[in-house]
Amino acid sequence: KMFSLSSIILAFFAGILGTLIGGTQTFICTGFVGLLIFLLEHVGVNTTFLNEALSNNLFLPCIIFNAAGLATAYAGTKHEIRGVETSRSLAFTNDPKVLLVSAIGGVLGYLIFAFENYFSFPVDTGAVSVILVGVLGRILFNQEDTYNEKNLDFLEKASPSFWGFQFLI
């Protein structure tokens, strides 16, 4: 079975949780959850449920961080926050639309992750999910320069030997 309804529901709420915690902090929480489960396993506790519910759904970075990242990008269009400030909790917005975008981001992150795992793509499925949702957030909600033109001056000024060297390495 490709998708699990319980995982979709958990991803929905994980998205909201990630937005309330803050994107960067979700990685810290993921580490603590992993450490807790490891310690419980070490002392003989059956952690099957904790692994399935917490590690593989609620605190899976491609779900919880995706959600926080997408919600932050959206909040950047409506509130006093830049769309790249994933280290901040979005609780200050008091905006149900931000929570809805985060829930959608969590579900989308899960669906991409589950799809890739179902077909056993030889990639880091979590990373691909984060990249795809991040690009989607950039396309939908970007209000800043996509790139810094000053940093691309070397393209016009570079000599042929520079490009030859770049090609060789």
Locations of the language-model features?
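Membrane-water interface of transmembrane alpha-helices
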Residues: 69-82, 131-149
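Early transmembrane hairpin of solute transport permeases
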Residues: 6-116
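Membrane-water interface at loop-to-transmembrane-helix junctions
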Residues: 93-98, 152-169
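Interfacial/capping segments of alpha-helical transmembrane domains
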Residues: 28-32, 146-152
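A membrane-topology feature that recognizes alpha-helical transmembrane segments
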Residues: 106-112, 127-130, 134, 141
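Alpha-helical transmembrane segments
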Residues: 55-67, 121-136
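Flexible hinge motifs at transmembrane-helix junctions and intramembrane kinks/re-entrant loops
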Residues: 24, 121-125, 143-144
